[in-house]
Amino acid sequence: MGKTLYQKIYDAHVVREVANETPIIYIDRHLVHEVTSPQAFDGLRTKGRAVRQPNKTFATMDHNVSTQTKDINACGDMARIQMQELMKNCQEFGVTLYDLNHPYQGIVHVMGPEQGLTLPGMTIVCGDSHTATHGAFGALAFGIGTSEVEHVLATQTLKQSRAKTLKIEVQGKTANGITAKDIVLAIIGKLGSAGGTGYIIEFTGEAIEALSMEGRMTLCNMAIEMGAKAGLVAPDETTFAYLKGRQFAPQAPLWDEAVAYWKTLKSDEDAIFDATVTINAAEIAPQVTWGTNPGQVIAIDQIVPRLNSFNDPVERASAEKALAYMGLTEGVNLTDITIDKVFIGSCTNSRIEDLRAAAKIAKGHKVASHVQAIVVPGSGPVKAQAEAEGLDKIFIEAGFEWRLPGCSMCLAMNNDRLNPGERCASTSNRNFEGRQGRGGRTHLVSPAMAAAAAIHGHFADIRTFATVS
């Protein structure tokens, strides 16, 4: 019997597997940030242990950093302490750190791939739930807790049970203007926020193969939002072209050897998945979440669901609670919903392709007078490239704020946050209650949709944006 891509990677990394015990797998790459690592390093220090493979461990600062200044004190005492601890720990244990003043500093799931730290066939972990992002390269990548962070630092291994496999095939081509964000939100809308629980998802199909690496990262980033452990896309020529020449990618003469191996990393034709879901790409429209989990999502040309449309009493109760929190009335057109803030950024949508898409919409327009709109590049290199292309000038002339790299308004752990009752069109990955600030109301959209909302002051369909403008 053939193997799935997940099974091939997992089997290649098993260190120990015996009956009645959880298998132990080897971890190729460990990414670290300031929030989930301090206690892990303290654990090593207390037990007199070293980092077993410091050359396979890389750290950056992202969650707590200010996007307006490089001052370590800007976001309060807790943020300062966590960043100072990360600097101390990385120096003591010999771990590479991209700190606030390093040109590579940025969101961990943006920094890793762009430096070539993320490679096909690897196992990658980080103390962050959106580590699944790296699965876009055909790597088995997933988030871990702080105690597991300590374990990987000490042993370069992790106990990990075998997971079920789910194949999601997006058949056909998407319409113009439909992005990876729309694809993944449509998938979550179909499966629900728990539809992938217990599975490793492999995304396949013509629409997936057509995505850039940035798009595939957006896709895999949100696999966790349907409950999955990880998301995978098999590596192909798009993957290899992205990786070639990057700092930590194999260099000649090892490059050809690496590519030959990477080409074997695909599910066999006779591989059996535990479940399969198919999506028609042509039916996917620009998506907007209306509720308080990513599964509460509809197309831009639809109305906010009526409560009597939910047959399941649990779903109906959830929808009723979500509508109350979001301050929405059932049956309202999405395009009639006004917004207060716009956030373009996060590990989901802060790469150069995302900024280009938003700038294309913003060019020649002005942000609505009542809207605050911020653009936060995902890393130093993304910021530098955007500025070299003049994207920063387009945003600034349109009335957007151009910021420094960081996680920013994705989560309320720094100075970028919503005030109670404020409504935000956000390119991030979670719209839970209070995610962007206590009482804040989050709607998840693509970068282009976020830019259009900023200009109109309400949600707008980018398919008719030129006409509306």
Curated annotation (Swiss-Prot):
HAMAP family reported in the protein's UniProt record: LeuC_type1
A single BP term in Gene Ontology: L-leucine biosynthetic process
Protein name in UniProt: 3-isopropylmalate dehydratase large subunit
Residues annotated as binding [4Fe-4S] cluster: 347, 407, 410
Purpose of the protein: Catalyzes the isomerization between 2-isopropylmalate and 3-isopropylmalate, via the formation of 2-isopropylmaleate.
CDD domains linked to this entry: IPMI
GO molecular function annotation: 3-isopropylmalate dehydratase activity; 4 iron, 4 sulfur cluster binding; metal ion binding
EC code: 4.2.1.33
Family per similarity comment: Belongs to the aconitase/IPM isomerase family. LeuC type 1 subfamily.
Leader sequence residues: none
Cofactor detail note: Binds 1 [4Fe-4S] cluster per subunit.
Classification via SUPFAM superfamilies: Aconitase iron-sulfur domain (SSF53732)
Phylogenetic lineage: Bacteria, Pseudomonadati, Pseudomonadota, Gammaproteobacteria, Enterobacterales
Keyword vocabulary terms for this entry: 4Fe-4S, Amino-acid biosynthesis, Branched-chain amino acid biosynthesis, Iron, Iron-sulfur, Leucine biosynthesis, Lyase, Metal-binding
The keyword Amino-acid biosynthesis appears for this protein: yes
Residue intervals passing through the bilayer: none
